Swiss-Prot record:
Belongs to the RRF family. The keyword Chaperone does not apply. This is Ribosome-recycling factor. GO terms for molecular function: ribosomal large subunit binding. One of its GO terms (biological process) is translational termination. The gene is frr. The keyword Cytoplasm applies. It is found in: Cytoplasm. The lineage of its organism: Bacteria, Pseudomonadati, Pseudomonadota, Alphaproteobacteria, Rickettsiales. It comes from the Bacteria.
């Protein structure tokens, strides 16, 4: 019973952290990667799809990305999605290929990216607090139903708080590393 609460909490935290890391990949740092396009959603005749579901993405060089659209009828939608993605990219259309010149990161843009990064970090911490709240309420329900003793409840609450503190530290560490990477010229 006690292990179930711990395991469920750890599983939820792991899942939440993976979402947080995927958000971080979408923030551009010093080196260029196609992962900055992960958040681009394209409206197609099949509904809303991620960019990597309608095109092949590649890095041409340090300042250029290439998007090879599979269905020529979606080229316009892909271009619009990139323009409205707030990435600061202006696609050049060459048939079914879009070239994305990636501007150098200005000091101002770096500061904006750090703000976005911190927002993601705060959102991840809110998710962690919600997971903690759920675990605590579940533990208290178990104690009220006399399925666990009061001593077990307190021990479990301490264990949950320790796990949550470690997760907060992991989030802070990831934010700090990414911030250093963004601000590095």
């Amino acid at each position: 019973m006690l292990e179930d609460v711990i395991k469920e909490t750890n599983d939820k935290l792991r899942s939440s952290y993976e979402v947080f890391l995927s958000d971080l990949k979408g923030i551009r740092s010093g080196s260029l990667s196609v992962s900055i396009l992960d958040g681009v959603i394209v409206s197609t005749h099949m509904g809303k799809l991620r960019l990597n579901q309608v095109a092949s993405l590649s890095v041409v060089n340090n300042k250029m990305l290439s998007v090879q659209v599979w269905d020529k009828s979606t080229v316009g939608a892909v271009k619009d999605a990139i323009l409205t993605s707030n990435l600061g990219m202006n696609p050049i259309v060459e048939g079914s290929v879009l070239r994305l010149p990636v501007p150098d990161l200005t000091e101002e843009r770096r500061k904006e990216l750090v703000k976005v990064l911190k927002k993601y970090g705060d959102r991840a911490k809110v998710a962690v607090r919600n997971i903690r709240r759920d675990a605590i309420s579940r533990i208290k329900v178990l104690e009220k139903a006399k399925e666990i003793s009061e001593n077990d409840m307190h021990a479990l609450l301490k264990k949950i708080d320790k796990i949550i503190s470690e997760e907060d530290a992991r989030i802070d560490d990831a934010v700090s590393k990414k911030e250093t990477d963004i601000l590095k010229v």
